[in-house]
């Protein structure tokens, strides 16, 4: 019987590659997306359109509103920085977001009798978010196996991070080798009303850098600067 895996799937470059990797590894992918009040709602439209064509057995969209808490340029009126990737944790960091996302994934995994979760975090070409680091994932996996019925019964739950040590260029090359169509992904934090990527936020800059280093043209549409 094919093993199930819950895939955290935003509709972005990394999570789409992650879904393709899980499928290649023989898992039946269950895609999990979140509408949490993010200003870049375009990613959800992409996720809804492409989860099943990408091979997801099911696609669950969970809705909650982190705008009530604020604290991030992605969930409040704070301006999205456009001056480049800096050294400090940027204002686009959403407090505890991956902890929240993984908790929903953990709950759905238990319901599905599933012991594998995939998340597309990356610790090389990234914005410096603390919940994208290997130490965080390791600690969360330890907690998950202490806090669940499956873990207590010895059915070890594993959090897979296949992109954690890859550059953005390597992620793109991996995805292309698996047939990922990157025109059907969205990365921009501050897109135009027509969906065009800004080309200047951290996420756009990292994406463009990755495509340039991979020697591939980015197929998404950008605003004319």
From Swiss-Prot:
SUPFAM superfamilies, per the entry: Adenine nucleotide alpha hydrolases-like
Cofactors required: Zn(2+)
EC category name: ligase
Residues involved in ATP binding: 9-19
InterPro entries in alphabetical order: QueC, Rossmann-like_a/b/a_fold
GO biological process: queuosine biosynthetic process
Residues involved in Zn(2+) binding: 188, 198, 201, 204
Parts forming coiled coils: none
Biochemical pathway: Purine metabolism; 7-cyano-7-deazaguanine biosynthesis
GO molecular function: ATP binding; ligase activity, forming carbon-nitrogen bonds; zinc ion binding
Keywords per UniProt: ATP-binding, Ligase, Metal-binding, Nucleotide-binding, Queuosine biosynthesis, Zinc
UniProt cofactor note: Binds 1 zinc ion per subunit.
Cited PANTHER family: 7-CYANO-7-DEAZAGUANINE SYNTHASE
Family to which this protein belongs: Belongs to the QueC family.
Known role: Catalyzes the ATP-dependent conversion of 7-carboxy-7-deazaguanine (CDG) to 7-cyano-7-deazaguanine (preQ(0)).
Name of protein: 7-cyano-7-deazaguanine synthase
Origin species: Geobacter sp. (strain M21)
Lineage: Bacteria, Pseudomonadati, Thermodesulfobacteriota, Desulfuromonadia, Geobacterales
Encoding gene (name): queC
